[in-house]
Amino acid sequence: MSNQFNAGDTVYVIYRNPHAANVAHIKEAEIVHHPYHEGELSLFIYETYHPFAEDDAVFASYEEAKSLYKELFDIDPYE
């Protein structure tokens, strides 16, 4: 997943609330160099570095993220 993006890119993430499994939002994040793992990229969201995982829902545009969100949850994220 991370090979599609470069440091400095702005991306959109479908982010699930870790305290409420049925709550998810589309959030803007930035691709940055991981400060502790040289050569690795990570997502910077909520003032935290998140290493990329294979199942991350990361998109180059808000529209792409919204399309999958609507498909997964059968609702518009902000209606």
Swiss-Prot record:
Keywords: Transcription, Transcription regulation
InterPro entries: Tscrpt_reg_SplA
Top-level taxon of the source organism: Bacteria
Job of this protein: Regulator of the spore photoproduct lyase operon (splAB).
Protein name (database record): Transcriptional regulator SplA
Annotated source species: Bacillus subtilis (strain 168)
